[in-house]
Structures are given as structure tokens and as C-alpha cells.
Amino acid sequence: NNPNGITGGYNRSKDNVALSAYGVLGYEFDAGEVLSKTTLLRSTDDVTRSLSGIESREERDLTDVILEYVQRQLFSTSLSGVNELMFDNLESKLEWRLGYSETDRLEPDRRSYYIQSGQLVPTSVERRWSDLNEVSKDLGFDVDFAAGWGADNFSTLTFGALISEKQRTVDLWRFSFRPGTYA
């Protein structure tokens, strides 16, 4: 079912480049451990889409084209640790963590236009540029205190805290033609 009465074809080409890296470094010692994790994900997409056809009602040829280039990146790193501590007869464990991540999406140039009956439709021409950046910072800890009551009983008290800060910025620029009114 084709409500617009358009017959034609759709072409799409896509070039994609991706890079992924993950690293872990840790150290264990008598009273605990420290662990560092880092992740990097990066990709670029270069896409061309073209829709061409003939509108059967008015016998017009139509072409719709979109050219798009997008870069994406995620960088994340964390540092965490566990320390076992002893206070009088209380066994305790401190788990702590620090985290930082940054996400970027950059679309430095996206173009679209529409051709009808061999003529460029000026109001269809659009160029767009956008940049999205998000940064997250986290700091947290958990503390366990365990105390025994006799040979078979014990209790554990746990508390913790998390401080998290997130910031997002978006810049978007869109340029196109608008028809004017003439006096």
C-alpha cells in the first residue's frame, strides 16, 4: 500500500569505524585490595541516504538525500578498594569507590535536500551541527561493622554514602531556508 503513489528506490551507504579498549589493574594486600578499571569506546558513522522515485499522480521525479557524519565516544574510569579494619572486638570492612565518565556525541555536519522534477527545492536544504557532552563524577563508600555475641551469634551494621554529580551540555545549530512573504 503506497498512499503517495511513489515508485522508486532507496539507496544507503554506511561506513563505520569502531575502537574499543578495556583495561583492569589491581593489587591485593593483607588487609584489602585496590582495583582500577578503564573503558574507551569510540565510533564514527558516515552515512549517505538517497530516496528516488516518481510520483504517479503528477508524473514528477523526486529525490531526497541525507548526508550525515557522527562521532561517538565513551570514556569511563573507576578506582575502588576494600580495606578490612579492626576496632577493639569489632571486625569492619570499608568498601570505597571513585568514578568518572564522559560521553560525547558530535555531529559536525548533517546535510539534507530535496529535488523535485530536476529542481532543487530551496526550503528543503538544511545543514545541522550538534555537540552533546555529558560528564559524571561519583564518590561513595560502604562500611560494615560485625560483632559476635557468644559462639553462635553475630550482628552486622552497614551504612554508606554516595555523592554523584552529572553535567550535560548540548549545542545544536540548524540552518535552512524559509520562504518569505513579499509586500
Predicted regions span which residues?
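Transmembrane beta-barrel wall of Gram-negative outer-membrane proteins
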Residues: 1-49, 72-77
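Face-selective signature of the C-terminal outer-membrane beta-barrel domain
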Residues: 28-43, 66-183
